[in-house]
Design a protein with these regions (language model features):
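Compact integral membrane and secretory-pathway proteins
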Residues: 1-152
């Protein structure tokens, strides 16, 4: 398997993880020793479905990279992966940790937030996009997948 195909596979898996993360619980607020869930939010609700847009762009960039678009699609995938990691770490992670900032903490003394599966999906998806972009950039300006360079 050449670098471009490996990069494409990683990128498509990453895009799928990002789409799944948007519809999966990113955090839930529980109260009391019985762990009663007072509120929960999906990844999309928490950051405005931004990662759906990233996933679409990742697929488009992957297709461009497979067609031999040079290093630019790979570098753009690295940037998209970095954006995903910033959203996960700067937007979603604090919401999974800060019980004192929760509206429920005013009404319930023992309210606390905990991370859902979406945070992990976002982190893995972001790392995979960075890796895919690096591989695609390393593959660089060779012949597109499925075509052989002209001999002569």
């Amino acid at each position: 398997m050449n670098l471009r195909r490996l990069a494409a596979a990683l990128s498509i898996v990453a895009a799928g993880l990002l789409v799944a993360a948007e519809f999966t619980t990113v955090f839930e607020v529980t109260v009391g020793s019985l762990e009663v869930v007072q509120r929960s939010a999906t990844g999309g609700e928490n950051h405005g479905y931004a990662l759906l847009v990233v996933a679409v762009f990742a697929v488009v960039l992957t297709l461009l990279g497979l067609r031999g678009g040079g290093r630019a699609p790979g570098l753009a995938l690295v940037a998209l992966g970095a954006v995903v990691l910033v959203v996960a770490l700067a937007v979603d992670l604090p919401d999974t940790r800060g019980s004192g900032r929760l509206p429920e903490s005013l009404a319930y003394e023992d309210a606390r937030a905990r991370a859902g599966a979406a945070l992990g999906l976002e982190l893995v998806g972001g790392v995979l996009l960075v890796a895919a972009g690096g591989l695609l950039a390393a593959a660089g300006g060779g012949a597109p997948v499925g075509r052989r360079p002209a001999s002569g």
